[in-house]
């Protein structure tokens, strides 16, 4: 199928739970991509975690052939995208390979902030956006209201939005027909020198690096000698093909097509995402504009429970970074936890998922320290340093000013929950920037400290709005704030992994609740364990985990009191000696207790 006019590259934009993966299943079924026996729910969510949590994390691609009502056969290249706010960079990568996007909106729930953000990304990249109303067979569906919401909030014409139900398969053919009519065919010269963009890469234990590519011009065949523009190393192509969703070798990919390429690259960083592939003979071909590098928002220390796992842990992180370009890591050592890595993530969900993938796919046992954001610190001599780890904060005497990152949060919610959401934003030290009433919905714009947003703001927003509010946020600037480091001392020793950077106004309260939390989590020892929270040299809170003690006077029946006193004194002296040499084991829960401190 060499005719470019018969190729359509598209992706689906939707909020979590609006039926994106189910719609993809129906497309595959309708176009006969898999036999009825191989078909299963959420075919494209290939990771166990994706299935269990019901979310899409990685972008996947499928090539289907569809015979339209007019009898023409079209090749549909469909790239699945995630919907959660933490994975928005995956979306922008997928969209770069498409000419069109389906904006899927739940006809019962209406438009949500995340789909608005992704939709604007698509429009900025010049894609044709087609609104689709899903779940119209639900009794509570209101397609007219939702169509007018799409027009009010996003500003694209939704009068003739396609209506379908991905679950029952109703209207799927209409969606495909509109897709063929509205999405432009790709442009590209098959005879020009090869130019292909790497959308995604992952590591296969047998094949090495497998890359998902979009060919913009020329064609890519097996046995071709190729180079990657940023690295310049030549490789020979072993395998070229498409996913139907199973891997299918075709031997050739032409301009406008999306498929995979395997070139026997064994180095983990051998095929960076966003790089350009070309033939070794035409190495002067210009590099395609890649993707903007995403900056991690949340940093946490990850440490293997047993130090023997350190090497495996490093390899596992390398393989994950190939598959997930936004993960950042560098080696770190902690007095309390030994050697590990400081990792950067896009948000809390991203962090949980990376930890879960490391534990499942690579069989590691990990301890995570409390996540922090990155702070800008100006020292007295005028130099500026960035701190992503509280224990690396310079001495308070040398600091002229500390600045915390501020994000702009866009929230959409029904009017009934406006009051509760505003109260939550004020608690989180937010500043209101804008408020608009759009039909039955309200769009709120707030500036909030990132530290307040990334930890538990999303969960709290969902609970105060009974799940109806949605959130999208992006970093705006660093702003000066009164920040201090809160240290936790256990038996007068600082535990570096438990340090926190907090706002001065809430430091005392946080210190007290953190010390109380620790008291619950640290098991009782044979001696008293003093837990203190301190700012600099000033202790702001203290609790004690009382010692377990044996009843040494149980064997004394009656008799002289001095005998009992002697035994009690002896026990006391023993405990004192024990306290000098005894070490307190801190359980994993205690490191994460920092998260549970209600601010």
From Swiss-Prot:
Pfam families reported for this sequence: EFG_C, GTP_EFTU, LepA_C
Superkingdom in the source lineage: Bacteria
Enzyme category, top tier: hydrolase
Gene Ontology CC: plasma membrane
Encoding gene, per UniProt annotation: lepA
Any GO BP: positive regulation of translation
Catalytic activity: GTP + H2O = GDP + phosphate + H(+)
Protein name as catalogued: Elongation factor 4
Disulfide bonds: none
Record localization: Cell inner membrane
Organism: Saccharophagus degradans (strain 2-40 / ATCC 43961 / DSM 17024)
Gene3D superfamilies, sorted: 3.30.70.240, Elongation factor 4, C-terminal domain, Elongation Factor G (Translational Gtpase), domain 3, P-loop containing nucleotide triphosphate hydrolases, Translation factors
Ligand binding (GTP): 17-22, 134-137
Domain tr-type G: 5-187
GO terms assigned for molecular function: GTP binding; GTPase activity; guanosine tetraphosphate binding; ribosome binding; translation elongation factor activity
NCBIfam families: lepA, small_GTP
Family annotation (SUPFAM superfamilies): EF-G C-terminal domain-like, P-loop containing nucleoside triphosphate hydrolases, Translation proteins
Similarity section: Belongs to the TRAFAC class translation factor GTPase superfamily. Classic translation factor GTPase family. LepA subfamily.
Entry EC number(s): 3.6.5.n1
Extent of the signal sequence: none
InterPro entries listed in its UniProt record: EF-4, EFG_III/V, EFG_V-like, G_TR_CS, LepA_C_sf, LepA_CTD, LepA_IV, P-loop_NTPase
Membrane disposition: Peripheral membrane protein
Keywords, ordered alphabetically: Cell inner membrane, Cell membrane, GTP-binding, Hydrolase, Membrane, Nucleotide-binding, Protein biosynthesis
Classification via HAMAP family: LepA
Function: Required for accurate and efficient protein synthesis under certain stress conditions. May act as a fidelity factor of the translation reaction, by catalyzing a one-codon backward translocation of tRNAs on improperly translocated ribosomes. Back-translocation proceeds from a post-translocation (POST) complex to a pre-translocation (PRE) complex, thus giving elongation factor G a second chance to translocate the tRNAs correctly. Binds to ribosomes in a GTP-dependent manner.
């Amino acid at each position: 199928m060499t005719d470019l006019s018969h190729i359509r590259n598209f992706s689906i934009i939707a909020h979590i739970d609006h039926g994106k993966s189910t719609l993809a299943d129906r497309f595959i079924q309708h176009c006969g991509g898999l036999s009825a026996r191989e078909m299963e729910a959420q075919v494209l969510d290939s990771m166990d975690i994706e299935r269990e949590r019901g979310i899409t994390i990685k972008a996947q691609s499928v090539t289907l052939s569809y015979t339209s009502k007019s009898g023409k056969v079209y090749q549909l290249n469909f790239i699945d995208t995630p919907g959660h706010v933490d994975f928005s960079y995956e979306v922008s990568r997928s969209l770069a390979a498409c000419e069109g996007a389906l904006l899927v909106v739940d006809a019962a729930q209406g438009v949500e902030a995340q789909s608005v953000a992704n939709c604007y990304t698509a429009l900025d990249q010049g894609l044709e956006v087609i609104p689709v109303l899903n779940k119209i067979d639900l009794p509570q569906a209101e397609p007219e209201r939702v169509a007018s919401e799409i027009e009010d909030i996003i500003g694209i014409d939704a009068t003739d939005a396609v209506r379908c139900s991905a679950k029952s398969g109703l209207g799927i053919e209409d969606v495909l027909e509109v897709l063929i009519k509205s999405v432009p065919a790709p442009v590209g010269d098959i005879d020009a020198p090869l130019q292909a963009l790497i959308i995604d890469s992952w590591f296969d234990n047998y094949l090495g690096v497998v890359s998902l590519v979009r060919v913009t011009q020329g064609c890519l065949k097996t046995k071709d000698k190729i180079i990657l523009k940023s690295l310049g190393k030549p490789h020979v192509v072993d395998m070229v093909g498409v996913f139907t969703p199973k891997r299918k070798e075709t031997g050739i990919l032409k301009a406008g097509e999306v498929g995979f390429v395997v070139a026997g690259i064994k180095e983990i960083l051998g095929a960076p995402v966003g790089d350009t592939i070309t033939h070794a003979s035409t190495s002067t071909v210009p590099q395609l504009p890649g993707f903007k590098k995403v900056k991690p928002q949340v940093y946490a220390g990850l440490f293997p429970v047993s130090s023997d796992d350190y090497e495996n842990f490093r390899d596992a992180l390398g393989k994950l970074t190939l598959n997930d370009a936004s993960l950042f890591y560098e080696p770190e050592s902690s007095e309390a936890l030994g050697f590990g890595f400081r990792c950067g993530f896009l948000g809390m969900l991203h962090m949980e998922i990376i930890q879960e993938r490391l534990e499942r796919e690579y069989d590691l046992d990990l301890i995570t320290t409390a996540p922090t954001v990155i702070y800008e610190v100006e020292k007295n001599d005028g130099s500026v340093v960035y701190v992503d780890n509280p224990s690396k904060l310079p001495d308070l005497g040398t600091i002229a000013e500390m600045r915390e990152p501020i994000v702009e949060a866009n929230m959409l919610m029904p009017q009934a929950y406006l009051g509760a959401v505003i109260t939550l934003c004020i608690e989180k030290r937010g500043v209101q920037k804008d408020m608009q009433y759009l039909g039955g919905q309200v769009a709120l714009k707030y500036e909030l400290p990132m530290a307040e947003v990334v930890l538990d703001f999303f969960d709290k927003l969902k609970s105060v709005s009974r799940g109806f509010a949605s959130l999208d946020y992006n970093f705006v600037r660093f702003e000066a704030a009164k920040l201090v480091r809160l240290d936790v001392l256990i038996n007068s020793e600082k535990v570096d992994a438990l340090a926190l950077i907090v706002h001065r106004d809430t430091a005392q309260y946080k210190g007290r609740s953190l010390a109380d939390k620790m008291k619950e989590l640290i098991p009782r020892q044979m001696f008293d364990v003093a837990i203190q929270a301190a700012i600099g040299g000033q202790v702001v809170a203290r609790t004690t985990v009382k010692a377990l003690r044996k009843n040494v006077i149980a064997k004394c029946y009656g008799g002289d009191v001095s005998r009992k006193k002697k035994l009690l004194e002896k026990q006391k002296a023993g405990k004192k000696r024990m306290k000098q040499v005894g070490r307190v084991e801190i359980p994993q829960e205690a490191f994460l207790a920092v998260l549970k401190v209600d601010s």
